[in-house]
């Protein structure tokens, strides 16, 4: 099973642990959402697909950026500052909270040996 989770969604825990997070390979997990959009443009993916408002599709009218209260350009810049450049700013607190609160999604299941 191939995942569509990107680095932005992975770091924020913005996926379902045993739903879209259950996979065998994650080819775009290292790419921020805005990087995926850039690559899609290079690959000549139809602009209507690239411009479609990101949504988990959990309910009618649900859109990621409204739920996160930030747009993905801002989110990706902040996440790159934090995780790629170790440059933490006070206004990144909400993103760090999402990262820490979703830590369990990035851990392997515990086993009793």
What function would you assign to each model-found segment?
Residues 1, 5-113:
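ATP/NTP-dependent adenylation/nucleotidyl-transfer catalytic domains that generate, transfer
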